[in-house]
Every structure is written in C-alpha cells, then in structure tokens.
C-alpha cells in the first residue's frame, strides 16, 4: 500500500509512522500508518477510493482527540486542498480552506455574511460538518451547496436542504461522505463595516 500511496501524491506529502500530536490542536495522540496531504480534490478523491475504510479524514485537527496508543489507519489531511475563488456574490472553497481565510476573502471582496467565521479555528469541511457558527451567524445562513465524495470516489452535490443543517449537525454526521468543498452566497456590503464586525 505504501508504494501505491507514493504514486498518488508527492513523496513529501506522505509522512509514514507519524505522531498525531503534530496534527491536532490539543497536541496529543499516538502514531498512525501515515498522514497524507493531497493537494487537490482530485488527489483526495483518488486516496479516498484507494484507502476506503483504512482511512480517517482530518482538517485542521481542531478539538480532535486521538488515543495515545495511536491508530492502525491512514489519516488524510485536507489542509493542502485549499483552492478558493470569488465569482459575483458567491465564494467557492475547497474543504481545506480555513474558516478565517474564507471570511477574509469575503471581506476583501466587500461581501457580507461570513463575518462570524473569522474566529472559528477549523476548515470549511469541518464548519459544514458541524454547521459551525458564532456571533449570531452559522454555515446554514450562507451555504448554497456542498460537494462530497463517497468511499468509492463517486461525487455528489448536496443542496442546502439535503445538508439538513441544524445546531452543530449536518447530514455528514450520519453518513460516510467526505466533504470536498462548497459554494456560499453572500451579499454586497461596505468593506469598512465588514472589517469592523
């Protein structure tokens, strides 16, 4: 399996026998088979299809505990899957984009609606997974759709309604899909007011 992984992504993006304490905000956890950093949704999809049940997907590692004994699994970190673009009043963001970054891009483009996200320490995927929110705003207020893959690499687009977003919950809590990105709809606003919020 290890040689197969090295064919799917760059050698420097695969850390074998890696301690999870380096990849969680709590700074604890034992070793895993490898931590793998795909650089695109395509690489993430290929890894998902290859590793299936032998893997765990992790974003920023915010509020995640890993047992000191470690895990007999591969960990796919989405931190390098971070393409982001702004078109009209919409932002498209890959799963590994930080919540702070998406809020910053919105502000730079005079778009309001994501101010609440600036202080959330996770990624877009983590934010969608738990319908993250703060300061009277949450993901369900601005998301249009989310993109995901199953463990066979099949892609699916989830509409806002299909996401079943509620307090710290989404449809992804109850299924095995891996979030790859999302589209957010915002509104034009005053840049100075947005930055001051």
Residue ranges and their predicted role:
Residues 1-124:
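Anion-binding (especially nucleotide phosphate/pyrophosphate-binding) glycine-rich loop
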Residues 86-88, 127-128, 177-181:
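Acidic/polar active-site rim loop that often engages polyanionic ligands
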Residues 39-41, 68-70, 79-81, 133, ...:
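Short loop segments at secondary-structure junctions
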